[in-house]
């Protein structure tokens, strides 16, 4: 059965000198260890994350796709590459360079690899322009972070960007980033285990409860990473609150469940019980295979959770593994 992995990451061979042209202290770069098989994403001289060669080497990436039986993978930026903290004009060269490098990465095997672009989301005009440029140059969509500092996705600037993408038929993947990392989150990778799912829940509910979906075109193709974070499990809580509290429903004419048809989620939930809940909540027609490859917290055997899920008929399994992504990206 065909497999299309719509959520994977890359990081280009950015040297420290190139990153320093944007910001020596906070712009990320790649240090490759002796031997070339492993390395670290660096911030100045501080190691941010250990990584291995598939993140930057498309040849190894394709070898791994072959091993996992994946026909096509859509790669996007590692979120630390976004550059939202900088002035939009100052970061524009960086963003376009990253997007061009993503296309170079995919050019190794264009029938196996596609790219989603990043945009300078902090500047609406530049973000819209880069999204359109990226589509014209071969990207199949854009990936954005789930917030801009104190601005959630219901902020009018971000809604306007989503409206542009809907009108221009540019698919959007929303990925959590810049989550709470201090205080009680410092140990055991808690930011990735707790804060990331909470960020995605916050983003989805911000769009729903603000009424933003009422202002967005139905042509917008929107997907949330990591199975929608905590949202599927807590949908009942939000639904109950909408019915019971007027302050919850003040800006949303319909309960949260009404909007499930307006977005997709990926399948990166790692447990058959979680996937069963996800299918029951969203429907198989709203879930796409996503692995988070090649990071350690990604699905280690890409697509096997869906392929082996009890209770899925062949039609539903095909939709999740490939069919929905074909429609989402217009492939």
What are these regions (language model features)?
Residues 121, 176-180, 293-295:
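Short glycine-enriched loops at secondary-structure junctions
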Residues 42-53, 62-86, 112-120, 140-144:
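Divalent metal-dependent hydrolysis catalytic cores, especially in the metallo-beta-lactamase
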Residues 88-95, 103-164:
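Long, hydrophobic, well-ordered secondary-structure blocks that form the structural core
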Residues 131-288:
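Catalytic pocket-lining loop regions of alpha/beta-barrel enzymes
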Residues 78-94, 125, 187-193:
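Surface-exposed, active-site-proximal loop segments in enzymatic domains
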Residues 11-15, 73-75, 81-85, 124-126, ...:
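Short catalytic/ligand-binding loop motif for oxyanion handling, primarily in non-cytosolic enzymes
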Residues 1-6, 13-72, 100-108, 129-133, ...:
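Mid-to-C-terminal alpha-helical segments outside catalytic/metal-binding sites
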Residues 9-53, 179-198, 241-260:
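Active-site gating loops and adjacent loop-to-helix segments of metal-dependent hydrolytic enzymes
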């Amino acid at each position: 059965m065909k497999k299309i992995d719509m959520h994977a990451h890359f990081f280009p061979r950015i040297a420290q000198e190139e990153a320093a042209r944007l910001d020596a202290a906070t712009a990320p770069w790649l240090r490759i260890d002796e031997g070339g098989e492993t390395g670290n994403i660096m911030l100045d001289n501080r190691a941010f994350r250990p990584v291995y060669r598939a993140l930057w080497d498309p040849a190894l990436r394709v070898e791994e796709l072959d091993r996992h039986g994946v026909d096509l993978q859509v790669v996007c930026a590692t979120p630390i590459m976004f550059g939202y903290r900088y002035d939009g004009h100052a970061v524009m060269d960086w963003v376009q360079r990253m997007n061009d490098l993503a296309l170079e990465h995919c050019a190794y095997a264009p029938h196996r690899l596609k790219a989603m672009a990043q945009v300078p989301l902090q500047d609406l005009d530049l973000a819209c322009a880069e999204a359109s440029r990226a589509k014209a140059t071969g990207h199949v969509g854009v990936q954005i972070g789930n917030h801009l500092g104190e601005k959630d996705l219901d902020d009018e600037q971000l809604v306007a960007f989503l409206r542009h993408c809907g009108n221009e038929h540019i698919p959007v993947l929303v990925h959590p980033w810049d989550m709470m990392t201090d205080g009680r989150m410092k140990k055991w990778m808690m930011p990735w285990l707790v804060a990331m799912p909470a960020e995605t829940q916050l983003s989805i509910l911000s769009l729903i409860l603000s009424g933003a979906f009422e202002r967005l075109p139905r042509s917008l193709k929107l997907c949330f990473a990591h199975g929608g974070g905590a949202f599927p499990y807590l949908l009942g809580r939000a639904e109950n609150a909408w019915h019971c509290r007027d302050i919850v429903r003040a800006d949303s004419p319909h309960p949260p469940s009404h909007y499930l048809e307006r977005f997709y989620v990926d399948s990166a939930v790692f447990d058959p019980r979680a996937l069963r809940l996800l299918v029951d909540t969203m429907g198989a027609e709203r879930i796409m295979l996503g692995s988070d490859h090649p990071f350690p917290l990604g699905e280690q055997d890409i697509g096997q959770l869906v392929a082996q899920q009890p209770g899925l008929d062949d039609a539903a399994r095909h939709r999740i593994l490939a069919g929905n992504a074909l429609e989402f990206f217009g492939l």
